[in-house]
Swiss-Prot record:
Pfam families: Formyl_trans_N
Site entry (Raises pKa of active site His), positions: 145
Keyword Transferase attached: yes
Binding site for N(1)-(5-phospho-beta-D-ribosyl)glycinamide: 12-14
UniProt KW Cell cycle keyword: no
Family: Belongs to the GART family.
Protein name as catalogued: Phosphoribosylglycinamide formyltransferase
Active site: 109
InterPro entries (UniProt xref): Formyl_transf_N, Formyl_transf_N_sf, GART, GART_AS
Species for this entry: Bacillus subtilis (strain 168)
Biological process annotations from GO: 'de novo' IMP biosynthetic process
Physiological role: Catalyzes the transfer of a formyl group from 10-formyltetrahydrofolate to 5-phospho-ribosyl-glycinamide (GAR), producing 5-phospho-ribosyl-N-formylglycinamide (FGAR) and tetrahydrofolate.
Length: 195
């Protein structure tokens, strides 16, 4: 059985969408671990509801980034994680984690990269007046939203859209497509079985 981890910092709606899809489709895979850098985040409650172990840590309690990333690596190895999916994890991945899991860390970003990297991507797109927005799933490298693109999905924006409606539509895209990309990268077929 393939095992993956999800890293999140907040509410965890993408985490829930991934795990729900895994269970509904009975994947031959396991969400083996949630990693969270905010011990009070709602996503931890979601993990508990699904009986998924979590590693919640306070970055300031570690000497430096390398130290907390080493603690994360120990948890990933303990849970035999093969793939890491960032889902609203609001930290850049450092050298320590990249050296251990390079090419096995993916992220979902709410824009059609390379446009609008970083925070508030949907707001940036809305203020720019673009006619097309979307999501990007990409491999993580040392930069911010700069890794090789795996998949993109787009939506058209019209004059009736508001920032809120665009955000809602982007979230729906994320919840639909991120689990599909994870399943594909785990080498599972459409029924969630090993391909």
């Amino acid at each position: 059985m393939k095992k993956f981890a999800v890293f999140a910092s907040g509410n965890g709606s993408n985490f829930e969408a991934i795990v729900t899809r895994l269970k509904e489709e009975n994947w031959d895979a396991s969400a083996a671990l949630l990693v969270c850098d905010k011990p009070q985040a709602k996503v931890i409650e979601r993990a508990e509801a699904f009986h998924i172990p979590s590693f919640a840590f306070e970055p300031k309690s570690y000497e430096n980034k390398a130290a907390f990333e080493q603690a994360i690596i120990e948890q990933l190895r303990l849970h035999e994680v093969e793939l890491i999916a960032l889902a609203g994890y609001m930290r850049l991945i450092g050298d320590t984690l990249l050296q251990a899991y390079g090419g096995k860390i993916i992220n979902i970003h709410p824009s059609l990269l390379p446009a609008f990297p970083g925070i508030d991507a949907v707001g940036q797109a809305f203020r720019a007046g673009v006619k097309v927005a979307g999501i990007t799933v990409h491999y993580v490298d040392e930069g911010m939203d700069t890794g090789p693109i795996i998949a993109q999905k787009a939506i058209e924006i019209d004059e009736h859209d508001t920032l809120e409606t665009i955000e809602q539509r982007i979230h729906k895209l994320e919840h639909k497509w991120y689990p599909s990309v994870i399943k594909q990268l785990l080498g599972l077929n459409n029924r969630g079985e090993k391909a």
